[in-house]
Regions:
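N-terminal targeting signals for Sec/Tat export/insertion, comprising classic cleavable signal peptides
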Residues: 34-72
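N-terminal signal peptide c-region/cleavage motif recognized by signal peptidases
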Residues: 22-24
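Beta-sheet-dominated interaction scaffolds and their linkers
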Residues: 27-50, 155-170, 204
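Intrinsically disordered, low-complexity Pro/Gly/Ser/Thr-rich segments with frequent PxxP/GP/PP motifs
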Residues: 71-103, 197-223
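Asparagine-centered strand-capping/turn motif at beta-strand->loop junctions
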Residues: 49-53, 176-182
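Terminal connector regions
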Residues: 101-153, 222-247
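Short, hydrophobic/aromatic beta-strand segments
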Residues: 55-63, 186-191, 242
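Bacterial N-terminal signal peptides that target proteins for export
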Residues: 2-14
Length: 247
């Protein structure tokens, strides 16, 4: 079972425990969805966590703005998560309420944050103050969290479909440049350049609102013409396919 020392030390454990992302090890806590969208007009939103494991877990949830080395107290983001710390028994769930506090965020574009869940197993029953040489692993899951202001033009799906692509060559090699002229984040999960009879893999990256991102084309040494096929991840976590002509 959990004791007071475990709860008291959770904030320290957040940055001193050995952390494993969900992509490298199997976490027992499952988040409802692979991304979260918070519409500005919503008073709050609910995120559900499920413990798929066989042991009770102590769970802390927080948001960061990309600086994941900072503690939640240092970041001071305009959101409150209730409860921030909870115990979830095996095969049980916990609903978290996320509330926007109305502090100033850009009104003309989405803001990108990250939702974090840290799960810490209980101390073994035979653990005591004199016997602390036991390794406990803390697992962290981290997914994208989008704050979406009201009244943005177009839609997230239209933004993904209307990305334009150009090509440039510099000291790093030949790159495709994705231009996002929309107020939405475009999460790109795959890019390929089709030129003549050849298809080139591209090091894909997501593109922030009103910005551009250069992506290195593997195996290409000079600029060319052709078509760009790319995949984006939508609000529901599904994949949408797109193809357009290189400009």
């Amino acid at each position: 079972m959990f004791n007071a020392s475990v709860i008291k030390g959770l904030k320290t454990a957040l940055f001193t425990a050995i952390l494993f992302s969900a992509s490298h090890a199997s976490a027992d806590i499952v988040i409802s969805g692979t991304r979260i969208v918070y519409p500005e007009s919503s008073k709050d939103i609910i995120v559900n966590l499920d413990n798929r494991g066989a042991k009770p877990l102590l769970v802390q949830s927080w948001l960061d703005d990309g600086r994941d080395e900072k503690s939640p107290e240092e970041l001071k983001l305009p959101f409150v998560i209730t409860p921030p710390v909870s115990r979830i028994d095996p095969k049980q769930g916990q609903s978290l309420r996320i509330t926007y506090m109305g502090h100033s965020l850009p009104k003309d574009r989405e803001s990108l944050f990250w939702f974090n869940v840290l799960e810490i197993p209980p101390k073994p029953k035979n653990a005591n103050a004199e016997n602390t040489n036991q390794l406990q692993l803390a697992f962290r899951t981290r997914i994208k969290f989008f704050f979406r202001p009201d009244g943005l033009k177009g839609s997230a799906l239209e933004a993904a479909d209307h990305v334009t692509w150009t090509m440039k060559k510099d000291g790093n090699g030949v790159s495709l440049v994705a231009h996002n002229e929309s107020p939405y984040n475009v999460a790109i999960s795959m890019v390929k350049l089709k030129s003549g009879q050849k298809t080139y893999e591209v090091a894909h990256q997501s593109v922030l609102p009103f910005s551009e991102k250069a992506m290195l084309v593997k195996g290409l040494t000079t600029t060319t013409t052709g078509k760009v096929a790319y995949e984006t991840i939508n609000d529901n976590g599904g994949v949408d396919n797109h193809e357009t002509t290189l400009k």
